[in-house]
């Protein structure tokens, strides 16, 4: 079975396009925004600028955050801005604490792994399974002959 069929439905268009202020396509969405000082404001978006603006208006990328406005104006002037607040100080303290913690755990010089200059002693190595251990020398020659014959499929 196929999907839904599409039909070309004629739509009447006005002779002149309507001005944007009269061309509202839906209700404005409202949200409550709190800034750093705890002041609550109601921000609306949607109908006035059209439903598909997504912050493309000039100068309205971050309208409610003063730090963002400061950074945007500094970006226009090609200057760098560093926000000095309690978060930066806490971050620097956490990084220095992490560095001291790692240095204490590693014990000074970094551990690079085992040295491969000399092989380990046989007492440290694991023992092989018993069926891997070769049998006595008395019938090893017969066993090898049998294995060779079976491999070469030669019957004597």
Curated annotation (Swiss-Prot):
Function, as annotated: Involved in nonsense-mediated mRNA decay (NMD) by acting as a bridge between the mRNA decapping complex and the NMD machinery. May act by targeting the NMD machinery to the P-body and recruiting the decapping machinery to aberrant mRNAs. Required for upf1/rent1 localization to the P-body. Also acts as a nuclear receptor coactivator.
Span list, region Disordered: 1-32
Residue window of motif SH3-binding: 117-123
Entry-linked InterPro entries: PNRC-like_rgn, PNRC1/2
Basic residues bias (residue ranges): 19-31
Domain of life: Eukaryota
Sections of the chain in a coiled coil: none
Keywords: Activator, Cytoplasm, Nonsense-mediated mRNA decay, Nucleus, Transcription, Transcription regulation
Subcellular location: Nucleus; Cytoplasm, P-body
Major subcellular location class: nucleus
GO process annotations (BP): nuclear-transcribed mRNA catabolic process, nonsense-mediated decay
Name used for this protein in its record: Proline-rich nuclear receptor coactivator 2
Organism of provenance: Salmo salar
Pfam families: PNRC
Family assignment from sequence similarity: Belongs to the PNRC family. PNRC2 subfamily.
Cellular component terms (Gene Ontology): nucleus; P-body
């Amino acid at each position: 079975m196929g999907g839904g069929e599409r039909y070309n439905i004629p739509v009447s268009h006005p002779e002149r396009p309507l001005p944007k202020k009269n061309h509202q396509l839906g209700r404005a969405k409202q949200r409550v925004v709190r800034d750093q000082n705890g002041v609550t404001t109601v921000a609306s978006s949607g109908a006035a600028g059209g439903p598909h603006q997504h912050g493309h208006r000039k100068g309205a990328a971050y309208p409610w955050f003063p730090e963002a406005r400061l950074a945007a104006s500094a970006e226009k002037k090609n200057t760098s801005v560093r926000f000095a607040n309690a978060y930066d100080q806490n971050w620097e303290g956490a990084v220095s604490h992490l560095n001291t913690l790692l240095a204490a755990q590693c014990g000074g010089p970094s551990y690079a792994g085992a040295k491969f200059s000399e092989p380990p002693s046989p007492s440290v190595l694991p023992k092989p399974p018993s069926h891997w251990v070769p049998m006595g020398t008395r019938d090893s020659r017969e066993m090898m002959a049998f294995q060779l014959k079976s491999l070469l499929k030669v019957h004597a």
